[in-house]
């Protein structure tokens, strides 16, 4: 089949849907791959690398979409690029919060964010792979912006205590952040409302708390050098850390929110007595790694939906993802 992908149109997106190595494997499977020129520029891959892997590089997005039967993207492209797609094509992307009423195209749509969270679907789970990078890069970002170092150090001049970190949410992002902060030398507490996640906290070397009330959460916030939120959210989710809790956060604490709602701050500005930064896409800070993982997810997905070089969308792992 003909597989195509174009440069991402979201201005802050650094990832690409395919790597040269995955392209090489797809070509070996009998597929044809067509890509827009400079598709991998922001993720560290050159057109010449793609060409050596068997890619056909085309000059425009329209050329790619006019040829491709299967279209792979990180995020859905703007309607101006999809208006001419046909029902014989399939568009595969992370549609996140975009509903069918807000996105109109004649092409079939496969929503990657709806991948079943089961062991048999792990190889195509872009949420898990990207969350892993998000947690690592978010923790690294926090450490970089701190006014102190993390580990306990004993010198002739003085003994430095280990930094104290609170991670809220035992999601994959939260677990990866906890693991990296621990390795960096922090004393880490992982908080989650589900007490069954205590073992997950232990697996990354963190203490565990199931704090849920105002008093319990504010007690956890006190004297922390790092606060990192990664709890699962929905559109109706309430903030876990509210403005009434801000006075309990000590000055110069680095506060990182990897969600839209975990912390009750609307603007992504640091005009508080602590340093605040919100980024739902920390994985974009490591685009080569994030792209490598995404592309391998797509390789496994294509092995499922086009095993004999023709489209088959009847697999139980795929049906929940169809729009």
Cite the ranges covered by each PLM segment:
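Adenosine-phosphate binding glycine-rich loop
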Residues: 115, 119-153, 261-323
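An N-terminal-biased, well-structured beta-alpha scaffold segment characteristic
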Residues: 4-108
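Rossmann-like NAD(P)-binding element
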Residues: 63-79, 209-242, 254
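ADP-ribose/adenylate-binding Rossmann-like module
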Residues: 86-103, 108-112, 226-277
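Glycine/serine-rich phosphate-binding loop and adjoining beta1-alpha1 elements at the start
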Residues: 2, 8, 77-163, 286
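Generic hydrophobic/aromatic pocket-lining and core-packing "Φ" positions
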Residues: 23, 47, 82, 139, ...
């Amino acid at each position: 089949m003909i597989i195509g992908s174009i440069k991402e149109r979201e201005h802050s997106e650094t990832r690409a849907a395919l790597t040269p190595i995955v392209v090489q494997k797809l070509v070996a499977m009998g597929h044809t791959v067509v890509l827009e020129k400079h598709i991998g520029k922001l993720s560290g891959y050159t057109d010449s690398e793609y060409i050596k892997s068997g890619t056909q590089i085309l000059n425009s997005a329209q050329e790619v979409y006019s040829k491709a039967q299967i279209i792979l993207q990180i995020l859905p492209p703007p309607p101006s690029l999809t208006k001419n797609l046909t029902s014989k094509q399939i568009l595969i992307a992370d549609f996140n919060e975009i509903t069918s009423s807000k996105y109109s195209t004649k092409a079939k749509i496969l929503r990657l964010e709806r991948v079943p969270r089961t062991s048999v679907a792990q190889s195509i789970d872009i949420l898990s792979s990207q969350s892993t990078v998000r947690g690592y890069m978010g923790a690294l970002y926090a450490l970089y912006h701190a006014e102190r170092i993390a580990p306990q150090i004993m010198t002739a001049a003085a003994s430095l205590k280990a930094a104290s970190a609170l991670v809220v949410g035992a999601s994959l992002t939260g677990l990866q952040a906890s693991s990296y902060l621990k390795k960096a030398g922090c004393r880490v507490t992982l908080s989650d409302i589900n007490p069954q996640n205590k073992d997950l906290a232990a697996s990354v070397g963190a203490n565990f708390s199931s704090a849920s009330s105002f008093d319990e959460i504010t007690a956890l916030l006190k004297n922390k050098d790092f606060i990192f939120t990664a709890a699962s959210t929905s559109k109706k989710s309430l903030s876990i850390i509210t403005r009434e809790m801000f006075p309990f956060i000590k000055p110069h604490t680095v506060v990182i929110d990897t969600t839209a709602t975990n912390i009750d701050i609307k603007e992504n500005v640091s005009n508080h007595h602590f340093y605040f930064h919100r980024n739902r896409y920390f994985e974009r800070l490591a685009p080569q790694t994030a792209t490598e993982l995404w592309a391998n997810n797509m390789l496994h997905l294509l092995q499922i939906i086009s095993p004999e070089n023709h489209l088959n969308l009847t697999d139980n792992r795929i049906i929940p993802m169809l729009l």
